[in-house]
Amino acid sequence: MVSENLMTVVMLPLLALMTIAGYYVLIPCEIREQNSRITPRRFIIGFWPFVVSASFVYLLVQSQATIIKFFDIKINSHYTSLIMMIEGDMVAHFQSFATPLLTYFNGFVYLIIFSFIMIFTFLILIFTRNVTALEEFNIAFIIIYLTAFPFYIFFPVTVTGHVLPGVSTLLYNLSPIIDQGVRVVDPFLDNGFPSLHAALSVMAMLIVMFRTNLTRYKAFIVISTIAILFSTIYLGIHWITDLVAGTILALISYYIAVKYRRTILNQPNRILVSIEKKMSIMDQIFCEKCSKQVSIIPHSTHIECPHCGSIQNYHPLTYI
């Protein structure tokens, strides 16, 4: 338990510092100034549904060991053998040039850079008021986790470093703190197919590349995603098949999120509005046409002005 907590204690402050640095380096100055006009209350009202929904799915997936134990699910290891039949020991070549420095660097990429781009992409979409992309990111994130979850329970694939001769689990060997920390989210070290590192990083890259105009961050996330994919193989964790499956899952999730965003969000938005009504959560805005103050339920998306009858679209994160 101490090791698990220590890994979190080390990572969180570092990720916080990187996020602050990224905010000033990767977000244009004019957007930072615009963001300062959002009131804390409106900011919280706007982003809490995204955090709650993504966190719920994440925690569900992390309950893997509990679910397996509760339902007495028998883990079958022959799926790892199937992957070995498909690709052999190709991944072993990636450790033929291993050095301590390269191992530490890839460990940093796998643990820190991956976590950073997931957190920062979410935050940067909020800061840039790109609600459409934020909704697509959230939908794709949930689809990826819910799709991967059954595979991790019923079709486990063990990390390459535990089954291939000549391949070491370089990441876990760096420190028992890392080994214990990783087992919190992957208790049996067999959450291989599909690769979440591949699926989530590629999905985030697609959102940033095609749904934003953040030039500097586009360059950063492309390089980071390539490095993440390489690190998963080099460190003795994933098979190439895992990465291919993860990439395909990212593409499908991105497509569904972009094409069917409005349809998917119809029912959740109704639930949000219902909750806000019951809790009497209201926001005060000014009509764009008559400039009179109007009360609106935050996630109702639009309102008809009672004074002039005009229709005005609204979201807490985009209204100034």
What are these regions (language model features)?
Residues 200, 235-236:
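Short, glycine/acidic-rich beta->alpha junctions
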Residues 156, 179, 186-210:
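Alpha-helical transmembrane segments of helical membrane proteins, especially in multi-pass transport
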Residues 1-160, 167-181, 213-223, 227, ...:
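Terminal transmembrane helix and immediately flanking juxtamembrane interfaces
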Residues 104, 186-188, 232:
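Short amphipathic alpha-helical segments at helix-loop
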